[in-house]
């Protein structure tokens, strides 16, 4: 029995990997999202031993996380540390999930809902805190069903995860028991999925006229470099190539009003070139290029560099044609075990990473910056920032009307990594009802509309430029913008109340039983 259950869990690990963007199909097989967790949930329902159930839960996530995040192993010289760190770092999370699953499945009658709620909590829990890594959420397994995921503008991405888990858990329960009562466990989640699809279709009809209006427009060039400037010897090449590609874009459209270069194009702070850069001539060429074309640039470069203690911030500079820097935004969310290195405050740890991997540690930014141009108010997000719904939502509440993501995922060397990141960006547009522009080093450079649909994009791992006349439509307030992840908080409260109520009833029954025994005696 145990061997069969572990095989089922491994099968789910493969199915969930195929459902999201992967190396076989870049967009993923989203149809699998509706059944990918079924083998796992059947196995969880079958196991009655506590250690076996907890072990199965950990085993599944090791399989799934390894298959879905293998590209972390390519993260520069210490990718293996990043990959192993992420896999091992989430074992305590899956152990905790397994622990709660055991007692919930043992105690509660509605196993379908118990599994659904606990797996949704798992998705949320690994999206917060020091080890936050919100990748591979259940919601992403159905990302190609655009009408379905529109419901994220009400309850957020975790509600979509809930719906996916609910359907999978219902199917698993029905396949185990196969009776009319358990048919309801499929009926309710199917109704929820159908209602979400219907909402998405109606939403697009209702917003069509509003989004057809135009308040302002802006000609934008997003430059895709396809060279990692942070690799040895690539720093100068990165600048030269970026200038060359930008010149090509300006030849095609001389009316460009805003140029966006990706994350980390410069390997030195833009405002301190003489102190940090070996070739001031090349940097002067860049400055003259900006002044000559009289166009504002957004450029990825480090800031607050301190080589003495080995730290810097990953930043975006908003540079005016006269070279004034109007904004410097620094990345707020850092990747655990890659940018956010445990114990980096100790000198021997800093020296180890600097000596062996030529890596400077990063410190988080602590404030948002809105880049203003005409009537556009851009919300800059650097790479991993866009994986956190609360940041994009906060930008929107502060008046931002378009998201712009600067990313360098070229180190991943895989299409699956680029497309997985792209899926994340789609949800931020849906949740907040605003467009997203992605300017990336190697993919996916694109413009995304308010529904999370791709307007234009470039191919991955190819040099190029994306020219877009971005239309600014009237903004509208989404329910998610107002309530955030309240759905999760309500779900947690419901689970706690149910658990406490069950515990109270158990204690009451035990008390009554002991009283009956005493009376008989």
Curated annotation (Swiss-Prot):
One of its GO terms (biological process) is lipoprotein biosynthetic process. The active site is at 263 (proton acceptor), 331, 383 (nucleophile). Its EC number is 2.3.1.269. The keyword NAD does not apply. The keyword Metal-binding does not apply. Pathway: Protein modification; lipoprotein biosynthesis (N-acyl transfer). It is a multi-pass membrane protein. It is found in: Cell inner membrane. Residues 218-472 form the CN hydrolase domain. Catalyzes the phospholipid dependent N-acylation of the N-terminal cysteine of apolipoprotein, the last step in lipoprotein maturation. This is Apolipoprotein N-acyltransferase. It comes from Borreliella burgdorferi (strain ATCC 35210 / DSM 4680 / CIP 102532 / B31) (Borrelia burgdorferi). The gene is lnt.
